[in-house]
Amino acid sequence: MTTWKFERPKQLPREKYITKVFSRYTLEDFVFYRNKIIEIEDEKARDFLMLALVDSAIKASWTMKDGAVVKIDKRGKPPLKKFFKYKVKRMFKDLRNANMKPVETVADIGNARELNLENETIDAVITSPPYLNKIEYTKIYSIEMSFLGFPDTRIKSHIGSRVEDVSVSEIGLDENLPLSAKVYFKDMNSALKEMYRVCKNNAKAAIVIGGGCFPDRAIESDRITAELAERIGFKTEETSLPLFTVTLTIRKES
């Protein structure tokens, strides 16, 4: 990284949602580093540095995440180069301190309702599904997703995104639920079934999920998800409720 000699990029991103939150100098630095990282042949090193770069670019931007809103603050920020070098050093330090053993890992984009996994092959699951009636995080992280090459439409096409009416009586739920809630829990039920299928006996799963708010009511997504899981065959061991987020630990029964 220290041997890279800066060259002003000939082309910069032109999307309005990007140009309005970055100075020209920050964008030039980002594109320069991105182009250099893309040239790295080692995939792990390339991904490692690209992750550090995207995180650093956001810190050097004028964006400020405030809950479900992205605000713009054009007060002076240190140059991207400073953030990037600090981030890479911090990530290297974390790797050294973690003392992780080399294991095979696989990262994939798929569908939680149709897992590409064999039956009873998983020991543990940790997941945070999309929250009911909450899609603003696709907007909050739109810049990061764009920089990493992921279209936000792929995210929105997942759990609870369909608009056609569905029946939920067969999974034991009230048909008077709002349409988006019915679609959401129908999908969640499918995801839980798949989770049950791939989990080994006595496997454990932790699900972080938040409640859903509608104009006429609040829906306890944690309670409903726990009920769906128990009907499928899981055993609810623990439920905790810090603010509006619940963690369910469920155990597959013998």
What is each of the regions a protein language model found here?
Residues 131-194:
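SAM-dependent methyltransferase catalytic-core segment centered on the flexible catalytic loop
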Residues 199-201:
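Helix-to-beta-strand junctions that scaffold the AdoMet/dcAdoMet cofactor pocket
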Residues 48, 203-204:
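Short glycine-centered segments of the SAM/dcSAM-binding site in methyltransferase folds
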Residues 23-127, 132-136:
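SAM-dependent nucleic-acid methyltransferase catalytic core
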Residues 228, 234-254:
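Class I S-adenosyl-L-methionine
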Residues 1-36, 147-171:
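Conserved phosphoryl-transfer catalytic core
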